[in-house]
Amino acid sequence: VEILLGGEDGSLAFIPSNFSVPSGEKITFKNNAGFPHNVVFDEDEVPSGVDSAKISMSEDDLLNAPGETYSVTLTESGTYKFYCSPHQGAGMVGKVTVN
């Protein structure tokens, strides 16, 4: 499944921002805009036992150019919340449910 970082209209958002995947399906986050974005999973908002650092980009690492991607595969069932660290304050947050 492919998730876009940034809307065609320049909005600071994950598109879609709320989605579900089967366990083990690769999720690819793709920068869709000229702004630097990243993907960080909230350590308090992932299933118990999941190390958020292992599935997140570093807070300092950014997808700077349109078309740059970051992929992750989630295997533990449950709900994961994530955000873009530069734009979290602007509401750039999302949620994935792993079935």
UniProtKB/Swiss-Prot annotation:
Alphabetized Gene3D superfamilies for the sequence: Cupredoxins - blue copper proteins
Annotated phenotype, changing S17G: In 50% of the molecules
InterPro entries (alphabetical): BlueCu_1 (IPR000923), BlueCu_1_BS (IPR028871), Copper_blue_Plastocyanin (IPR001235), Cupredoxin (IPR008972), Plastocyanin (IPR002387)
Keyword Transcription annotated: no
Cellular component GO terms held in the UniProt record: chloroplast thylakoid lumen; chloroplast thylakoid membrane
Function: Participates in electron transfer between P700 and the cytochrome b6-f complex in photosystem I.
Protein's name in the database: Plastocyanin
